[in-house]
Curated annotation (Swiss-Prot):
Fe cation 1 binds at E25, E60, H63. GO terms for biological process: intracellular iron ion homeostasis; iron ion transport. Belongs to the ferritin family. This is Ferritin-2 heavy chain. The keyword Cell division does not apply. Fe cation 2 binds at E60, E105, Q139. It is an enzyme of class 1 (oxidoreductase). It comes from Schistosoma mansoni (Blood fluke).
Amino acid sequence: MSSSRARQSFATECENAINKQINVELQAAYDYMAFFTYFDRDDVSFPKAAEFFRKASHEEREHAEKLAKYQNKRVGRVQYSDINGPTKTEFSSLEDAMNTALGMEKAVSKSLLELHEVASKNNDPALADFIESEFLHEQEDAIKQFADYLTETQRVGKGLGEYLFDKLTLNE
């Protein structure tokens, strides 16, 4: 592998932290794909929830791509790690799924904050700004949305309540 002439002021620790975050995002995408396939099953059949989680999976994959593109822009090298199987493939309810998703979003957010800390520690304002502008604000919105959905699914309960939540709330 040849060394790039364009690389400057990009610490190896930052490069490694970006690679870690790429894999965190890909794991989240994989996990959300499991949510999608569960709610798309004929014996579960929450089509709006399935579509909601399919979009969430796609969004996480886009985040990984955005980070990989940034890594290349900074002349770092993207290093992929193995992705584990989904953390959960069955859910007792929409409430269970929203609770699991909220936990995932908080974990992704924590990882992004750690990446931001590495950027700051290595005096890399460009990386810190990239993480803030492209990810952290969006992450706050996602956490709020999942927290709201968790509250709403707790309020409506199982059965008809879940059906109406799927039809009315996730149809937005």
